[in-house]
Every structure is written in structure tokens, then in C-alpha cells.
């Protein structure tokens, strides 16, 4: 349970950033809150990919975030995690590139 915040104490936590456009633009009205949350997590991962120099041959930053990690992060089942990825793709927020051979997808 959290206590009250005093002074600068609210800054001791780390946060996921969610673009306001996901909540304000009519085209994202039907995007689920869970998908918006996942998008914030993916954006956070994008920063790590930049630091690690994860670029494809065209210089685009990608992330690797397997379904299992989504399940762990959001406390959901496999089918829900897969549905959230599809939802983000449908709204044009991510693109997944399949690599095959049991390797996780690259996410742009």
C-alpha cells in the first residue's frame, strides 16, 4: 500500500510513458487500454534498443519482446498477448517481422 507523497518523493518511481495522442485522437478511440499500455512498454524497450544499437540493414530501430514477456509484464495469457500485438498492428502502431526457426519477431 502506498503512503502519501511528500515533496519530490513522487519522482522515486520509474514510469512508462504513453503518448497522449492514443487517448485524444479519435482514430485510437477503439484501441483497448491494455494495447495502449503494451505500446508504452514497447516504447520503453525502444530506448534500450537504441542504446544497444539494434538497427536493421535500413537503419531502423527494432525491439525484441516475445509474447512470454508480454504475458509476464501484463499478467495475461498467451492468447491475450497475441491479440494485443495484432491490435497494435491493426492501428498501425507496430510492425512485426517474422524471423522463423523459433526466434522471436522483430518489432518496429
Please tell me what each predicted stretch does.
Residues 25-31:
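Short amphipathic alpha-helical boundary/capping segments
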Residues 7, 33, 45-108:
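Winged helix-turn-helix DNA-binding recognition segment
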Residues 1-24:
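An N-terminal low-complexity regulatory-tail signal and nearby short nucleic-acid-interaction modules
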Amino acid at each position: 500500500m502506498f503512503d502519501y507523497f511528500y515533496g519530490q518523493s513522487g519522482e522515486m518511481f520509474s514510469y512508462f510513458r504513453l503518448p497522449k495522442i492514443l487517448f485524444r485522437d479519435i482514430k485510437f478511440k477503439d484501441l483497448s487500454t491494455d494495447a495502449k499500455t503494451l505500446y508504452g512498454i514497447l516504447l520503453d524497450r525502444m530506448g534500450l534498443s537504441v542504446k544497444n544499437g539494434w538497427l536493421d540493414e535500413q537503419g531502423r530501430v527494432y525491439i525484441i519482446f516475445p509474447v512470454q514477456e508480454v504475458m509476464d509484464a501484463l499478467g495475461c495469457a498467451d492468447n491475450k498477448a497475441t491479440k494485443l500485438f495484432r491490435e497494435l498492428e491493426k492501428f498501425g502502431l507496430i510492425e512485426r517481422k517474422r524471423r522463423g526457426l523459433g526466434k522471436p519477431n522483430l518489432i518496429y
